[in-house]
Each structure stands twice: as C-alpha cells, then as structure tokens.
C-alpha cells in the first residue's frame, strides 16, 4: 500500500469510498445519517486536498481508502481527522496498514491524537488494538492519544 497526498483527479473516487465506508457504521451501532461532517461532500474533500490534509491509500494502482490529517504548527502532534477504507476491502488488514503508515508519514511527529464516537465499537477496539490510549471522553466521543517511540520518528 502507498499513502500519498490525494490527487485532484481522484477526489470523486475518494468521496465515494468515504460515503460507502461511513455508511457501514450503521452495522456497528450508528444511526442512519450519524456520519462525520461533510463525509460525502466533494467540495469539502477538494478543500482538504487543496490544503494538503487529504491523503489517498493506493493498492495496486487502485485508490482503496483515505485519511484526513492535520499536523500542528511545531510538527510534533498529528491529529487524525478520519481514516476510511472501501468496504469492499474490509477485513483484509488495509485499515491496520493505513494507520501504521499514517503513524510514520510525517517525520518528527511525537504523538498522534484522534477521536471516535463512543457507540462505534469497531473503531474503539481498532484504536485500542493499535496501542492508542483513551485520554478522556465526553457524552459523544472517546479521545485517544499515542506517544510514538523516538526510534519511529
């Protein structure tokens, strides 16, 4: 798998994958329409691509997923806005591979932060499996953080 900044020509494909991926959240406790903001918006994804926040996951020349990432000003903390894999490729280890690539994408990152809905048992288990520690929670979200080893930076 390759993780690279999204190409404008792939935005429609990335949005379609995002829509399919987040629409599957119904099967893990989400309500209909309980998806991330703008998950199905071409304009929003174009903006994320233009600002350098949208990445595409490519396997055998096919876009299979994406990530929205935000690096803080000093380059030490990476915020994962979202990651997604096309449901046609679920249960193949692509999500695990994508997150491991995200963790090493920006040199110098010391920690990664993200949040996920409390009701989404799939993503909460996924991030815990990857070594993310729950820092706090509110009525809707669990907030996770992972400190990266110096040898991985």
Locations of regions flagged by a protein language model:
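A short beta-loop-alpha structural element at the N-terminal edge
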Residues: 2-16
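A short helix-loop-beta-strand connector motif used in the catalytic cores of GNAT acetyltransferases and
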Residues: 42-56
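A short, internal acetyl-CoA/4′-phosphopantetheine-binding micro-motif in the GNAT/acyltransferase core
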Residues: 83-90, 116-117
